[in-house]
């Protein structure tokens, strides 16, 4: 896929990387390969074990602008109650929240096999001083984050 840029514009470093890339893609070929994989492997992967594995890979996430200590605690309670409601399945891998809610999740989380993941470093825009990003991330880890998404 060839990237096109206005000839009057100087490419930024990302555009330059695309311009210099030797990787070629063809949407029709990719679609055909996906269809082939689905036809050849759907039956062997359409089972409870695969579904359980996939569910156990999920980071259950709330990144709402309206998140609060109360809403995040209620969200965490759903994970705590999961085995009561669905004892036949493994729990999710992690609860993911904004970094300032790591301590809320740590205080409310009652199951030991679920990690606490946070989005940090001025997520989602990352428009902040590097010192701010480092401090935010350090505080999230101090507050109980097991994983940090940047």
Tell where the protein language model's regions lie, with residue ranges.
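Charged, compositionally biased N-terminal leader segments and the immediate start
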Residues: 1-56
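Alpha/beta enzyme core
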Residues: 41-55, 66-90, 100-150
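A short, histidine- and acid-enriched strand-loop-helix "catalytic/donor-clamping" loop
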Residues: 63
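Short, hydrophobic beta-strand segments that form beta-sheet elements in well-ordered domains
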Residues: 95-97
């Amino acid at each position: 896929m060839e990237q096109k840029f206005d000839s009057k514009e100087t490419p930024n470093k990302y555009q330059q990387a695309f311009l210099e890339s030797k990787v070629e893609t063809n949407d029709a070929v990719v679609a055909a390969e996906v269809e082939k994989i689905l036809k050849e492997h759907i039956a062997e992967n359409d089972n409870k074990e695969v579904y359980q594995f996939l569910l156990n890979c999920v980071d259950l996430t709330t990144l709402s602008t309206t998140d609060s200590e109360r809403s995040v605690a209620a969200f965490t309670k759903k994970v705590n109650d999961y085995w009561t409601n669905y004892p036949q399945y493994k729990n999710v891998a992690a609860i993911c929240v904004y970094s300032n809610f790591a301590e809320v999740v740590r205080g409310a989380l009652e199951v030991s096999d679920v990690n606490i993941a946070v989005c940090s470093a001025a997520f989602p825009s990352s428009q902040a001083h590097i010192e701010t990003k480092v401090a935010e991330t350090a505080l999230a880890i101090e507050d109980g984050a097991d994983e940090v998404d940047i």
